[in-house]
Amino acid sequence: MLTLYTFHNSICTQKVFITLAEKDLSYDEELVNLFAAEQYDPEYLKINPKGVVPTLVHKGRAIPESSLICEYIDETWPNNALIPDDPFLKSRMRQFSKLVDETIFEATRELSLSLIHI
């Protein structure tokens, strides 16, 4: 069974929701309310010591970070593959994913965090 620890306002979580939908996988969802600082709850920090969302738990093992979660899902459930087989195309996909994670997501994260403290 899959359990996804989420926060719906998180753009990183949205990426994982899309991957799960593309794979047609069912999962349990656990809301981690960042507005209420639930990411710092000791129980959640046992699952993800960095205190971020999303985190996927599968077979008792936690996978943090949205891009890693998406790759894990694609490799674990190979039906309807999302990652190309061709090494060059795979490297381009990872390059784009890294660009999004390090620029777009980082910018939206900073904006979101600034709104939390208003």
Where are these regions (language model features)?
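GST-like domain detector, emphasizing the conserved glutathione-binding G-site
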Residues: 1-116
